[in-house]
A protein has these predicted regions:
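Extracellular loop and loop/strand-boundary signature of outer-membrane beta-barrel proteins
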Residues: 44-47, 85-95, 134-142
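Outer-membrane beta-barrel channels and translocator barrels
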Residues: 6-10, 36-40, 66-70, 81, ...
């Protein structure tokens, strides 16, 4: 659930995210400010209002490039944990504030009908900083600090 309000070249989006995890759910409030310029820089701040009781920040850039009838969007981001225990703990088993991950991605949006799109994405993500590496390797299914993954979303805008 989110709402976006354009303010000149800046768009401000706020919303609520519900995460449905095995063994426990959590929810976050978030706000993102994005600037419509070269590389489209954005800053997102998340605050876990349930299980994590902490925050998370993401600084990102992205650029769309025409590719036939579609466009491909290349992106990069850096995540910074702000004592959010839902993101994992450091080697001492404590929440931490510090670098968490870096990610590069490639995505597109394929119109299906009306305001509905199919949005595939691939990405490579790796832990940054020793605390981030400790947290990510502890909660990852394979104990590794990096992952290559893909996703597909169906989006309806109204």
């Amino acid at each position: 659930l989110n709402y976006t309000m354009p303010i000149g070249p800046v768009s401000v989006t706020g919303g609520l995210i519900h995460y449905d995890f095995d063994g426990g759910d959590t929810q976050e409030l978030y706000v993102t400010c994005a600037l419509a310029t070269l590389l489209n820089p954005s800053l997102s701040l998340y605050y876990d209002i349930d299980d994590g009781e902490g925050g998370f920040a993401v600084l990102a850039v992205s650029q769309a490039v025409p590719a036939g009838p579609l466009s491909l969007t290349a992106g990069a981001s850096v995540g910074f944990n702000l004592d959010d225990k839902a993101m994992g703990t450091n080697a001492d088993g404590e929440e931490f504030t510090g670098l968490y991950y870096g990610e590069v991605s490639l995505a597109t949006s394929i119109p299906l009908f009306g305001n509905v799109t199919l949005d595939p994405r691939i990405a490579y993500s790796t832990a940054l900083g020793s605390d981030g590496e400790d947290a990510i390797t502890a909660i990852s299914a394979d104990g590794k600090k990096d992952i290559f993954y893909g996703s597909i979303a169906v989006t309806a805008a109204f």
